[in-house]
């Protein structure tokens, strides 16, 4: 009987020991911090794709700008740059409706809001210098202009509808914008222009004088 009691006591002691060890292990596990969750690879891939897409968009935009500049010669780009600076009346690097209106006013033309909106609507965004070159390039492609003189003529006629330019406005523009002319230089230039009794300059004759085409034709005829 005494032996049986001893066995029971030993059994209980073992069970209590086992329970104690189990509780200790559980407490240890609870005290150990859980490992940080690993980010899902799918989310990372999506972010990478977005970043890659943005980079591609940026490269595409740069390529588009570069291709426009390759259409024109350095001389043409310099001329367009000067024209852009003349048109950018508020000097913010962007040509808006008020800038276009001022450009038309400077050559004696009146453009209504509908016409100005139509011109601005041709651009895919704000008209900065690159966008202006793009518009001119598209206009040149449509008109079939290919050499330097034809590009200059087509660009000049963009702001001319009836073949005449107001002499006073043109004089003011020459003396106040771009490479500013002195009064004597303007007077000398006007002496060579075809100007009617209403002080209107013949655009075609002016273009011939600027490009030298009239002189070339006279030499060929001789």
Swiss-Prot record:
The modification N-acetylalanine is found at residue 2. InterPro entries: EF-hand-dom_pair, EF_Hand_1_Ca_BS, EF_hand_dom, Myosin_RLC. Residues 75-110, 147-180, 181-216 form the EF-hand domain. One of its GO terms (biological process) is muscle system process. Residues 19-53 have a biased composition (Low complexity). Residues 1-65 are annotated as: Disordered. The keyword Lyase does not apply. This chain binds calcium. This is Myosin regulatory light chain 2.
């Amino acid at each position: 009987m005494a032996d049986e009691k001893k066995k029971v006591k030993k059994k209980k002691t073992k069970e209590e020991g086992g329970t104690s060890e189990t509780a200790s292990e559980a407490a240890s596990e609870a005290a150990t911090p859980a490992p940080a969750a690993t980010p899902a690879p799918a989310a990372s891939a999506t972010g990478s794709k977005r970043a890659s897409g943005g980079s591609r968009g940026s490269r595409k935009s740069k390529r588009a700008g570069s291709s426009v500049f390759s259409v024109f010669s350095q001389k043409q780009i310099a001329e367009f740059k000067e024209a852009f600076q003349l048109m950018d009346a508020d000097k913010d690097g962007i040509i808006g409706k008020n800038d276009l209106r001022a450009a038309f006013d400077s050559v004696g033309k009146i453009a209504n809001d509908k016409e100005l909106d139509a011109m601005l609507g041709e651009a895919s965004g704000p008209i900065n210098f690159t966008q202006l070159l793009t518009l001119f390039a598209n206009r040149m492609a449509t008109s079939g202009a290919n050499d330097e003189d034809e590009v200059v003529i087509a660009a000049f006629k963009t702001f001319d509808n009836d073949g005449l330019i107001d002499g006073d406005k043109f004089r003011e523009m020459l003396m106040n914008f771009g490479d500013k002319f002195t009064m004597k230089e303007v007077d000398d230039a006007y002496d060579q222009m075809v100007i009617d009794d209403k002080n209107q300059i013949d655009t075609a004759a002016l273009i011939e004088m600027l490009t030298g085409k009239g002189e070339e034709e006279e030499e060929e005829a001789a």
